[in-house]
Amino acid sequence: MNSKPSWLRVKMPGGEVFEEVRDLVKRQRLNTVCEEAACPNIGECWNKRHATIMVMGDVCTRACAFCNVKTGVPRALDLGEPERVGEAISKLGLKHVVITSVDRDDLPDGGASHFAKCIREIRKRDPNVTIEILTPDFQGKPGAVDVIASARPDVYNHNLETVPRLYARVRPRAKYFNSLQLLQQVKDKTQGVFTKSGLMLGLGEQKEEVYQVMDDLRCAGVDFLVLGQYLQPTKDNIDVDRYVTPEEFEQYKRMAYAKGFSMVASSPLARSSYHAEDDFLRLRALRTARMRVAT
């Protein structure tokens, strides 16, 4: 498409705190989805000392059409990574952290146990840190959700990414209903854990299709919906079909709340981990208020 509209233009990242976070990530030999996915919000987030750690390497076993992460044969798991993640979170002084990963279809459990180890290393240093994880679908491997559930994350995020009709083009190695089933399993197996999912808009989806995905997510008990504009990371990725206007994002937000989501982030630059701490605090306060009313 032609140049981005004004509402998608952001400042070039930089600044003292930004450089401090980048140096710390490099010293700890960690990857971040902020860098690997070319996130437009990296400047704002890193200047607030917010970073989304991407574990299990920087090579993915899949090749989703929208993603900027490298595809290929990944290296063996770095067994020291969970400890380094814990140290980095402690040094950054974070109170809410987001951990994500590449797909690791080569591993027997898809990397679920590695997620669990990262959660435990963070909590070992500060039991009060709240932890949000954004996981792949683990190809539906038996026991993967149970392993992560045992580590008790505060928020479990798995993104559907797009509407079912576009899966063959956008997520050719994933299945829509497998992702829905994972989110349902998380709800069934974890008490008190918030579930979250997101869609990229501007890939050719129709409004009615987005509404149907909202209904499917609510049937799976998902609490939090994120809707953001798809931005083409490189010319090799799938093209942007159109730029969804801020007014349309507001319409989607109103509809999502009407369908029963507890929290909705819907704007052109909304991303899974953007303002994650603030959103989590609001979500937790909302649940507390509802429990008080119920009693």
UniProtKB/Swiss-Prot annotation:
Query: Keywords, A to Z?
Result: 4Fe-4S, Cytoplasm, Iron, Iron-sulfur, Metal-binding, S-adenosyl-L-methionine, Transferase
What are the required cofactors?
[4Fe-4S] cluster
Under Gene Ontology molecular function, one entry of this record is: metal ion binding
Q: Which residues bind [4Fe-4S] cluster 2?
A: C60, C64, C67
Gene Ontology CC terms: cytoplasm
Query: Is Metal-binding one of the keywords?
Result: yes
Tell me where in or outside the cell this protein is found. Answer: Cytoplasm
Catalytic function, reaction form? [[Fe-S] cluster scaffold protein carrying a second [4Fe-4S](2+) cluster] + N(6)-octanoyl-L-lysyl-[protein] + 2 oxidized [2Fe-2S]-[ferredoxin] + 2 S-adenosyl-L-methionine + 4 H(+) = [[Fe-S] cluster scaffold protein] + N(6)-[(R)-dihydrolipoyl]-L-lysyl-[protein] + 4 Fe(3+) + 2 hydrogen sulfide + 2 5'-deoxyadenosine + 2 L-methionine + 2 reduced [2Fe-2S]-[ferredoxin]
According to UniProt, the name of this protein is Lipoyl synthase
Q: Which organism is it from?
A: Anaplasma phagocytophilum (strain HZ)
